[in-house]
Amino acid sequence: MVEATKKAFVTGHPIKHSRSPKIHGHWLAQHGIDGSYEAIDVAPQDFAEFIAALQANGFRGGNVTIPHKEAAFAVAQRRDQAAEEIGAVNTLWFEDGVLRGGNTDGHGFAANLDDCAPGWANTGPAVVLGAGGASRAVIQALKQRGFSDIRIVNRTLARAQELRDRFGAGVSAHGTAATDELLADAGLLVNTTALGMVGNEGLAADPALLPDHAIVTDLVYVPLETPLLAAARARGLKTVDGLGMLLNQAVPGFEHWFGVRPQVTAELRALIVADLVPKP
């Protein structure tokens, strides 16, 4: 009997911008797997119906992105520790007939820094700019790696305070007026906001205020070098762009669906970098 094609998906609304099919398609071809990974646009009101039909439609699981991560958290019958701590699911898979949910964003964040800035977890206090969903994943990863002084900076202080209360000891909340003071002894600066994206240029913090040993990373990857990273590089600081987080967060899901743990390679990165360049 010929085994059916292994199927996975990424769903969001909208979803046509997703680079995930290119990432997983590269790995499927590399490993010679008879599989598929498709982008499916699902409106919020149709999400529950979409999930209910996954097995009937032959899917082993898939990725979930904005705006469905909280809905995926609710529908998963079992959730991993990261998903519980973050309160959102970005990866779904079936195991013994049970729909399981995980969150690989924190893994992607930490693995990117492991690859590009070895020793990053021993640099001192971390300043996290922003208090949205991405910030939750970053804080979860930082706590897992042993950070005991995590400073959330957000324009709306109440949002930062919510995350402080969620993650507890070692996490503090601050308004943007405190940014300069917080940077003075920080070893890691993380931008989780949209500031720096194409069309939303600007600096959320001044890297010139950081110590010489500090590392600066930006979750934005379009452009690859944001104004924040450019300023940090000009200051002589170690910088890490956000593309590696996207690539590394995809690894656990691929293993769940297709049975092989793929590698994030220079070849894969080059493939996605080429796709980031605007088409004429």
Curated annotation (Swiss-Prot):
GO terms for cellular component: cytosol. It holds the Pfam family Shikimate_DH. InterPro entries: Aminoacid_DH-like_N_sf, NAD(P)-bd_dom_sf, SDH_C, Shikimate_DH, Shikimate_DH-bd_N, Shikimate_DH_fam, Shikm_DH/Glu-tRNA_Rdtase. NADP(+) binds at G130, A131, G132, G133, A134, N154, R155, T156, L157, A158, R159, L219, G242. Homodimer. One of its GO terms (molecular function) is NADP binding. The gene is aroE. It is an enzyme of class 1 (oxidoreductase). This is Shikimate dehydrogenase (NADP(+)). It comes from Mesorhizobium japonicum (strain LMG 29417 / CECT 9101 / MAFF 303099) (Mesorhizobium loti (strain MAFF 303099)).
